Design a protein with these regions (language model features):
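Conserved beta-strand hairpin/beta-sheet module of binuclear metal-dependent hydrolase folds
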Residues: 1-49, 153-171, 188
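Divalent metal-coordination and catalytic microenvironments
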Residues: 5, 35, 46, 63, ...
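Active-site-proximal loop/helix segment associated with metal-binding centers of metalloenzymes
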Residues: 15-17, 128-198
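Active-site neighborhood of phospho(di)ester-bond hydrolases with catalytic His/Asp-centered motifs
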Residues: 33-37, 57-64, 97, 167-173, ...
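Active-site metal-binding motif and surrounding structural segment of the metallo-beta-lactamase
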Residues: 40-92
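Short histidine/acidic/glycine/proline-rich micro-motifs that form metal-
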Residues: 66, 94, 100-101, 233-238
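Metallo-beta-lactamase
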Residues: 88-153, 250, 258, 262
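Cap/insert and terminal regions of metallo-dependent hydrolase folds
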Residues: 174-263
C-alpha cells in the first residue's frame, strides 16, 4: 500500500531503549512528518525506514517539549543542506501553533550555520496555524486543533487520507472533550498511553498529565473510532508492551488496537 503510517519512535520523553514518539504519514512518494524526537536519532530512524529527505515537504510540530522539537532542528538542517547540494526541489513548510514555530525558528537560528538559515523565509517556511486552521500536507488535507494542554500549548490534527478515511492525532496528553467533534468516529485515533493502569503507581502517569492504555481504550470506545494506535509509552516493559497494552485497551474497546514498535509500518489505505 502507498498510504501508511511509519512509526519512527514510540517512547515518552525519558526513554533510552526506544526513540521518542514521532512518525510520518506516507502518501505515495510524499512523507508528512510529525515531530522529530529529541535529537539527531531522527536521521537514523528515517534512514532505516527509507524516508528520503527529498520526500518531506511538510512537518508538523505539536509542541515545544525537548522530546519533540530538537529532532526537527536536525531535519531542517539536513534538508537545507540538501537544497544547497541541489538534491531537494521545492519548499519545506513547518506547521505548528505560533509560539511553537517561533521557538523552533529561534533555536534553528541560534544553532545552525548561515548557509542553512539563509533559506528561512524563502524555501524553508515556519508556518503558524490557528486553532481550527486548515493545511495541506503530502497531498492530503488537514485540520489543526488546540488539544487544550495545561502544560505547554500543544496542537493535534485531523488528516483526511487519500481514500477518505480520517486520521486524528491527539498529541501526547489526555484527550480534551473540547475536541469531541473532531475525534468522534475517526478511522484512526493516535493516542498516548504512558503505561498500563496496573503500573500507574510505578510510572505515575496522572501526576505527569498523561494517561494509560486503560484510559485510551475507554476513550476509543466512547468516541466510536475504528482503530486505536497507542504511543508515547514508557520503555521499561518493551518486551511485553505490545501484548499487555493491547489487552488492557481491548478490555474496553472492541475495535482494532495497535501498539507499534519503533520502525513499524502500519498500512492505512
Amino acid at each position: 500500500m502507498t498510504c501508511s503510517l511509519m512509526m519512527l519512535g514510540t517512547g515518552n520523553a525519558a526513554v533510552t531503549r526506544c526513540y521518542n514518539t514521532c512518525f510520518a504519514v506516507r502518501n505515495g512518494a510524499q512523507y508528512f512528518l510529525t515531530d522529530g524526537g529529541g535529537g539527531n536519532g531522527i536521521l537514523a530512524r528515517m534512514q532505516q525506514s527509507g524516508i528520503p529527505l527529498a520526500g518531506i515537504h511538510e512537518i508538523f510540530l505539536t509542541h515545544t517539549h525537548t522530546d519533540h522539537i530538537f529532532g526537527v532542528v536536525w531535519v531542517v538542517r539536513m534538508i537545507a543542506q540538501s537544497m544547497n547540494a541541489g538534491k531537494y526541489a521545492g519548499v519545506l513548510r513547518v506547521y505548528g501553533h505560533a509560539e511553537g514555530v517561533q521557538v523552533l525558528e529561534s533555536i534553528c537560528r541560534a544553532t545552525l550555520p548561515g548557509k542553512v538559515t539563509a533559506h528561512f523565509g524563502l524555501d524553508i517556511l515556519f508556518t503558524p496555524l490557528e486553532d481550527g486552521a486548515a493545511f495541506e500536507a503530502a497531498g492530503m488535507q488537514g485540520l489543526a486543533f488546540d488539544i487544550g494542554s495545561t502544560k505547554a500549548r500543544q496542537f493535534g490534527y485531523a488528516l483526511v487520507l487519500p481514500d477518505g478515511q480520517r486520521l486524528v492525532c491527539l498529541g501526547d496528553e489526555p484527550y480534551n472533550e473540547r475536541n469531541e467533534s473532531i475525534a468522534r468516529g475517526a478511522d484512526w485515533l493516535l493516542c498516548e498511553a504512558f503505561c498500563l493502569l496496573a503500573d500507574a503507581e510505578r510510572f505515575k502517569p496522572y501526576e505527569k498529565h498523561h494517561s494509560t492504555a486503560h484510559d485510551a481504550g475507554r476513550l476509543a470506545a466512547g468516541l466510536g473510532v475504528k482503530n486505536l494506535l497507542l504511543y508515547h509509552t514508557e520503555d521499561a516493559t518493551l518486551e511485553t508492551r505490545r501484548a499487555a497494552y493491547a489487552a488492557e485497551a481491548a478490555s474496553h474497546f472492541s475495535g482494532t488496537v495497535l501498539v507499534p514498535d519503533d520502525g513499524e509500518i502500519v498500512d492505512l489505505c
